[in-house]
């Protein structure tokens, strides 16, 4: 089984020029809408140009592209293959990013919109969970990016 997992959507109705999707994530207890209005990187590189990542201690992400294209860079040293690049579009389903996975994303030139149907655990604190971590100041232990 791959370390990279998706929560697929279900098409439950189609009419001319309209598709109805069930995008339910049973595990979700929070939803975030993340809009990149152009070719954005989140989190952006730091002041010296080093990559930065988010690493949530108390949240699993279920990131689903609803418009555009977004590419995720993932590092998780507990996986058999700790480094992955995953390109998402509206057909991909929700990319599951487990807690403690280093991650960042890059949008295509036209930007992108992602809904994150997250699962937040006891101890979640938004002011702590969304602080970028710089590779210049923090080692990823196994690999250098």
Where are these regions (language model features)?
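Tight coil/turn sites that cap or link beta-strands
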Residues: 38-45, 91-94, 98-100
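Short, conserved beta-strand element in jelly-roll/cupin
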Residues: 56-76
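Short beta-strand His + acidic residue motifs that chelate non-heme Fe in jelly-roll/DSBH
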Residues: 72-73, 97, 103-109, 116
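A short hydrophobic beta-strand segment most commonly corresponding to one strand
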Residues: 109-129
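Low-complexity intrinsically disordered segments
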Residues: 134-138
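Conserved small/polar residues in nucleotide/adenosyl-binding loops
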Residues: 143-145
């Amino acid at each position: 089984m791959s370390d990279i997992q998706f929560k697929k959507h279900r098409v439950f109705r189609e009419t001319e020029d309209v598709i109805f999707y069930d995008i339910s994530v049973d595990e979700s207890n929070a939803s975030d809408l993340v809009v990149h209005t152009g070719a954005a990187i989140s989190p952006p590189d730091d002041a010296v140009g080093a990559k930065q990542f988010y690493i949530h201690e108390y949240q699993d992400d279920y990131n689903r592209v609803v418009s555009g294209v977004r590419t995720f860079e993932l590092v998780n040293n507990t996986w058999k293959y700790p480094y992955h690049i995953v390109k998402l579009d509206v057909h991909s389903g929700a990319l599951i990013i487990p807690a403690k996975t280093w991650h960042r994303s890059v949008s295509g030139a036209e930007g992108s919109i992602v809904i994150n149907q997250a699962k937040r655990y006891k101890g979640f604190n938004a002011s702590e969970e969304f602080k970028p971590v710089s590779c210049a100041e923090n080692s990823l232990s196994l690999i250098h990016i």
